Amino acid sequence: MEVKDIDNYCDRGISPNASNYLTYPFDGLCLQKFFYQLQTSLRRFTPYEEIIYTTVYIIISVAAVIGNGLVIMAVVRKKTMRTNRNVLILNLALSNLILAITNIPFLWLPSIDFEFPYSRFFCKFANVLPGSNIYCSTLTISVMAIDRYYSVKKLKIASNRKQCFHAVLVSLAIWIVSFILSLPLLLYYETSMLYVMREIRVVDQSGQEVIRSYGWRQCRLVSAGRLPDITQSIQLLMSILQVAFLYIVPLFVLSIFNVKLTRFLKTNANKMSKTRAPPKRFDRSDSHHNSLKNNNNHTSSLRSPSMPSIRSSITERNKTNQRTNRTTSLLIAMAGSYAALWFPFTLITFLIDFELIINQDYVNLVERIDQTCKMVSMLSICVNPFLYGFLNTNFRHEFSDIYYRYIRCETKSQPAGRFHHDVSSIAHHRQDSVYNDEATLLTTGRQSNGKDGSSSPIGFRSSVRVCSGQTKMIGDRIVLDDDIEKDSFV
């Protein structure tokens, strides 16, 4: 602002034609009040809107801290939960937890006021830390989708320390890639002063004449030492990276591998139905005629427990279809929730960075839409622990144990048939397959036992701990009904 503009708000009582008009000091108290009013008028949101946004962000952050904290605690406190799949879930929960903690102080509060309240270090830190955690979260979800597909298809056991170490290495690689993607935020974001009144002579409260400047410190992509075109190119590059790795790549991976997994499960459900087809009906006339000759032998063969009835076959087929439909719905929810939560933020950020919304009449509206889209995308840190943790039965058992132990201060009685099993594509592939396309479940069991088909194969028992439950076919392997019930591959 020019001196004559400031003089309209803080009149010094001197004629503009005076020789000392430019150097005559202003009243310091008047300038301070004027600057405060100007700063208040430039606040992006009204007090009512600030209360609403702050309340919603607090609810999101608290819910995310509780949900992701429970997931982390469930994996860390017991060795049986430290599997390859759970290491990836732990990595996702850790990134979401950090984002929940840093959301309000580093993302929301600086956006309320026109001035950035922190130092140069926190200007970089406040952008790099949330940015790298968002990238880590989305990349982990992508890796989990790939791992989930190959886990179910090949049934790779993941429980020992060496195999979990591979998952830890994958998680570290995800963090490194996330930091590299956030590196432009560290290099090019700086604090800069936006001055309103610079080097103005004022008289302070003690009556001394001093020189002061009034302005706001802002954290932004600065062009100091660089041409404006280069700064704009850097901004566009960061926007393209954000759209690609925060939305397009994760959504593409989720869609492709979840569709492949859904088709795989439906195909094997059909194979299972054919394998469990009811036997050929027995002719009553022949039965009656033969029973007169050899009643005891044929009666025992007809009532043999190894021959499933038509009713039990239909029941098992319906259960299989229900499990497949439930899993399909969960996979659709994973991809759909990600697409719905991140699309508004990705779209509005892309439009703002490429200056496709430059109408000054709608600046306030764009500010509110942008903040609302950010708030919607932050809901993912609450949804992720629910989709990847609470819908897993093994995690629910651990959450129940944590509740009884630390809230009710008592020990929960463990069910007799509790089952801990996990599969992961990061683990080494088992060479001793238990099932092939030419063999049925019954013949496989007979070959392994040599006497009856009710025993499980020896190789399968050595790799998986079974408490109870019948076996089911998935692809060219055998998994458990209880495993499918617990959604351990999801």
Curated annotation (Swiss-Prot):
Amino acid composition bias (Basic and acidic residues), ranges on this chain: 280-289
PROSITE patterns: G_PROTEIN_RECEP_F1_1, G_PROTEIN_RECEP_F1_2
An example Gene Ontology CC term for this record: plasma membrane
Region (Disordered): 272-322
Glycosylation sites: N17
Pfam families: 7tm_1
Low complexity compositional bias, start-end: 292-313
SUPFAM superfamilies: Family A G protein-coupled receptor-like (SSF81321)
Stretches of the chain found on the membrane's Extracellular side: 1-55, 108-125, 188-236, 353-374
Main localization (coarse): membrane
Keywords associated with the record: Cell membrane, G-protein coupled receptor, Glycoprotein, Membrane, Receptor, Transducer, Transmembrane, Transmembrane helix
Gene3D superfamilies cross-referenced by the UniProt entry: Rhodopsin 7-helix transmembrane proteins (1.20.1070.10)
InterPro entries named in the record: GPCR_Rhodpsn (IPR000276), GPCR_Rhodpsn_7TM (IPR017452), NPY_rcpt (IPR000611)
Highest taxon of source: Eukaryota
Membrane topology designation: Multi-pass membrane protein
Compartment list: Cell membrane
Topology feature Cytoplasmic, residues: 77-86, 147-166, 258-331, 396-490
Transmembrane portions of the chain: 56-76, 87-107, 126-146, 167-187, 237-257, 332-352, 375-395
GO molecular function term, any single one: neuropeptide Y receptor activity
Family: Belongs to the G-protein coupled receptor 1 family.
Cited function: Not known. Putative receptor.
Record's protein name: Probable G-protein coupled receptor npr-8
Gene transcribed to yield this protein: npr-8
